[in-house]
């Protein structure tokens, strides 16, 4: 009984304590206006301060033209071309029919695209029939005046004189002109591609003549005489800073046998300056030279009894250059951005002299040299009679230097994607190609300029597309306004 009374007493005391706590700590009336104002002020301050907080942690990204950048890889660059065909005929001809026929042949002659991914679609064509008593013109009108060219001008055997004469009358502007002298059936057709932007054909009037004219316009003036399978324009060796450094190296394999030197400065001033000036619209070219000693090649040669010389083959070319002994990187100004083309004259040692390159067809190379795309070219030079001269210094003769530079110029043309042939074989006529004193004809320089522009645009589009994808994948990446402004110029 006593335990039950104690429990009841404890419960009563606990209830009394709880009642007292409730009366002392809990409100019995509703909150006042002051409490509501304080709560509202805290909530309002949070709402007003949230934009500032959001702005303080925001990643600034200047708007970029992602759509325009992505479309760069799908757009083709179309250069405008202006063609002109001039027919010098003793009898009147239908210029409209000739114009239509040549247009048809041009469309047939453009089956593949250039580096820009475009075909020959943006061009104009003018056809002029210049006969003794009549002058008919169809298509675009250019600067040629009827009667300016005499039919007798093509009778001269001096093709350079004819070339310069035509330049006076059809050489203005970037108009590619084909002059056709229509003759009788007894004449053998012949054609010449000039050094400037024109060619001339002497042929009888036939159905093949329109094809001949279209071939010159498309395959020569448009494609530069190159064909599929030749060195492609991707190999144009222009650096990121627009410079090409031509490094010429004379390598004495064993100076105990002979010690050759050269007066390169005189050759530079007489032969290389015209080439550098001709290529100046494409790249800023600088020239360097050096003479090295103890520079053996890395490949082996063998004695050929039939040819009476030591020989090496095209299969040996990848191992010919000795990168361990040939210290060819002479330029300190390149800075990793300029492309350096190495041109090497390798003087063989006495124990393998004469050293000659055997081509895949079994014949000896006429130049005794080879090229490596994007690297340069090599010429193997053998001293006369291979007689040891000891360590006394001997200078290469001006004639030898001239021959060497001519081979180097041909190698440079190949490295730039051009052919060094003396003729162009068309479907009906074999055309003679007139060489230029500066190493490159005007129509070849035009093609190089177009391909160089295409190459730069293609590289730029690829780089911008890659950067665009990278920026899209990094949403927290900061993009300043200057980047946005520069990117906005990509579509201009």
What are these model-derived regions, one by one?
Residues 2-292, 296-307, 311:
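Long, solvent-exposed N-terminal ectodomains/accessory regions
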Residues 4, 447-492:
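Membrane-proximal extracellular juxtamembrane segment immediately upstream
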Residues 169-465:
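Extended, non-transmembrane interaction/recognition domains
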